[in-house]
Amino acid sequence: MEARVERAVQKRQVLFLCVFLGMSWAGAEPLRYFVAEETERGTFLTNLAKDLGLGVGELRARGTRIVSDQNMQILLLSSLTGDLLLNEKLDREELCGPREPCVLPFQLLLEKPFQIFRAELWVRDINDHAPVFLDREISLKILESTTPGAAFLLESAQDSDVGTNSLSNYTISPNAYFHINVHDSGEGNIYPELVLNQVLDREEIPEFSLTLTALDGGSPPRSGTALVRILVLDVNDNAPDFVRSLYKVQVPENSPVGSMVVSVSARDLDTGSNGEIAYAFSYATERILKTFQINPTSGNLHLKAQLDYEAIQTYTLTIQAKDGGGLSGKCTVVVDVTDINDNRPELLLSSLTSPIAENSPETVVAVFRIRDRDSGNNGKTVCSIQDDLPFILKPSVENFYTLVSEKPLDRERNTEYNITITVTDLGTPRLKTEHNITVLVSDVNDNAPAFTQTSYTLFVRENNSPALPIGSVSATDRDSGTNAQVIYSLLPSQDPHLPLSSLVSINADNGHLFALRSLDYEALQAFEFRVGATDRSSPALSSEALVHVLVLDANDNSPFVLYPLQNSSAPCTEPLPRAAEPGYLVTKVVAVDGDSGQNAWLSYQLLKATEPGLFGVWAHNGEVRTARLLSERDAAKQRLVVLVKDNGEPPRSATATLHVLLVDGFSQPYLRLPEAAPDQANLLTVYLVVALASVSSLFLLSVLLFVAVRLCRRSRAAPVGRCSVPEGPFPRHLVDLSGTGTLSQSYQYEVCLTGGSGTNEFKFLKPIIPNLLPQSTGREVEENRPFQNNLGF
């Protein structure tokens, strides 16, 4: 069956144009749509997008919903096309009962922005029910003395349909004695009366069996039948007569079942069985029969079921009084049901938005409707929420309310809100309903990660393992989810000379710091860098902290003997006159340690000697002195092994081997200073030498002769007391900055001896080229200063 969709348009005259322009959809006539009952599910009713003047996309984007009072899902809105479809078959009799027209109101709710349109679905009746008599057989007793034209009330049929499909006519099977008159009760119900056409003769026909047919107005019409049995009696010339033809009574809806509503009374002037009256309902509907019952003897009307003002406000009953002779009379009882405050307000939630963003003020959290089935003040309601919440209630049309956030929320303070909506009516006593809503607050990236400290100090012992962390930093973010996930990183170094990327790394997930290589205290004692903490949001927020790394010294350098050199192919021999007194300074062992602190404190001791007890070594300065007078028995060649040990844990050591030659007497040898290695990097010096050589060949010849003479002297003096200073590997901080691998001139020495003196000492001369020191780094100068001070430079 096709659904016929109509939209009622009414023309109105208005006095002022401004009044017309100020009218809103909420106050306009509702949209009306019509559909026949029993229409198949999925039937197209209308296109709401066209009716509302909206595009299909706009209709979907605005979150259109269908809300009905009955909360029934009888309509379906297609979000793709905007079509309004029937969601289920409708039974008009079940939905509306006898009410006509059958109108189902509903609302079209648009959320973004909030807007409400009223609409109505009119369900058209179809002829799907035939008239039905409650009693298949109707019995009548008629006195034979009854005059023609007398009317006898018959039981009416019931038809659940309404309008033209409802009960419209009665007929009776053809006969000469009776016909049917149809009467309207004034409330849309018709009932039949059997009218006598001619005088009865009990002796001729004592009983009649006629068929009463009830017809409805449908097309084609439906019908129902009942058998009417008429028993012709002797004369009973008085029918029962009610004291009042109309009874009106008001009954509270909370009256208990079984309570008396009203008592009706009729009189009959006859005697005997003809005067005995029985009360009963006449053409009563099924609803009346379920709600009321009447005492057939006393005429007392009682409640059979609980009344409900919200369902039916008025009942109209027809009561018949019939005597024993078959005569009857009737009266009408009108029962008005009065309302009491027996219904709590109802909260119908249309939509709920949860979670909501914490930085979104004036956000519609929920849309709901308040309904109270009572009337008057009993149906008026007041709606409220707690005072200490950042939300407000805004009333709208048709008892709709919106719950709106009043100001920006702070998820870090409250992650959720438990809102209790209290609805109270104005009846006596007041009834209230509470509805709890939990609103979750979603996180917004409004907090940057924060380090637990503004600066960190890490202590790392040198020669550390790169696989082990040297420390960690930690930052927390008060946000949640990805907004709280922290990524750690190294920030660019502010020191351009610090190779930070090759020195340390950081674990981006947990902030653990790693040294990419083993640290060397002698090369780098401390450094600092900045680390950053960034969350994973977009845009991301970040913070930074300063990390100080202090390298702790380890005893990883053994003492290094500067003098005498131990890697020379020609051993160093020190001359010692046999006439030397005890305490005579033979030589001095000079050593340095690349470590610092107590790891660099050196002590000296004599480990081995050719003549034990002949020599002694001072523990703190390394001076080798005679311990007694020399004798002729002492060997001419003495070999001493001096142990140099630092104060580390565990201690490291080195040995120096000395050769001492005992002589009877000698003059002061002249030892030529070793030639300093040329600085190949100094091109200016080369250019100057070339220029001087080209200008004066005579000067060059003089220099060559001078060198030849010096070499001759050196060859003659070598066997006696000469100490060679050969080239060899040195600690890095002792090697010349030119990179030639030779000992820096600042550590070259000349031995000066005077014959015949028993207190001769070594004199360590100042460097020949003092301007080399400023070329070294500040750290190297600082490391060398203790050694220079010990030597008295």
Curated annotation (Swiss-Prot):
Main location per the UniProt record: membrane
PROSITE patterns assigned to the protein according to its UniProt record, in alphabetical order: CADHERIN_1 (PS00232), CADHERIN_2 (PS50268)
Signal peptide feature range: 1-26
InterPro entries: Cadherin-like_dom, Cadherin-like_sf, Cadherin_C, Cadherin_CS, Cadherin_N, Protocadherin/Cadherin-CA
UniProt membrane topology term: Single-pass type I membrane protein
Extracellular side stretches: 27-688
Record carries keyword Repressor: no
BP terms from Gene Ontology: cell adhesion; homophilic cell adhesion via plasma membrane adhesion molecules; nervous system development
Keywords: Calcium, Cell adhesion, Cell membrane, Glycoprotein, Membrane, Repeat, Signal, Transmembrane, Transmembrane helix
Entry keyword Hydrolase: no
Record localization: Cell membrane
GO molecular function, one term: calcium ion binding
Cytoplasmic side of membrane: 710-793
Sites carrying sugar chains: 169, 418, 436, 567
GO cellular component terms listed in the entry, alphabetical order: plasma membrane
Transmembrane parts of this sequence: 689-709
Domain Cadherin stretches: 35-133, 138-242, 247-347, 352-451, 456-561, 568-671
Function: Potential calcium-dependent cell-adhesion protein. May be involved in the establishment and maintenance of specific neuronal connections in the brain.
Protein name, UniProt field: Protocadherin beta-7
Species lineage: Eukaryota, Metazoa, Chordata, Craniata, Vertebrata
Underlying gene: PCDHB7
